């Protein structure tokens, strides 16, 4: 398992809509994320800057690089494109974050 983190940007005034859409995330998308090796995925918001900070844990043999090929993933990105910053192909703009510190319980 490894953990990655990245930053995205939410458009102003879209917090409630972003939360609503994620509360109603499509079961097919959840299944595809799990099948790709995603084991834990959390997104946090800095309300002052509208930056979203995502932390994702995935299996060592993950296949996340194939997610953009999936119709349901593309459909989700199209669905989210009106409320966040995206590239011309409607994928969310993401900036990888560099890990600087980790604290784990000795039993891990």
Swiss-Prot record:
Active-site residues, Swiss-Prot/TrEMBL: 22 (proton donor)
GO molecular function: L-rhamnose mutarotase activity
Any one GO biological process: rhamnose catabolic process
Residues that, per the record, bind substrate: 18, 41, 76-77
EC identifiers of the protein: 5.1.3.32
Assembly, per entry: Homodimer.
Similarity comment text for this entry: Belongs to the rhamnose mutarotase family.
Function: Involved in the anomeric conversion of L-rhamnose.
Name of the featured protein: L-rhamnose mutarotase
Species the sequence originates in: Paraburkholderia phymatum (strain DSM 17167 / CIP 108236 / LMG 21445 / STM815) (Burkholderia phymatum)
Lineage start: Bacteria, Pseudomonadati, Pseudomonadota, Betaproteobacteria, Burkholderiales
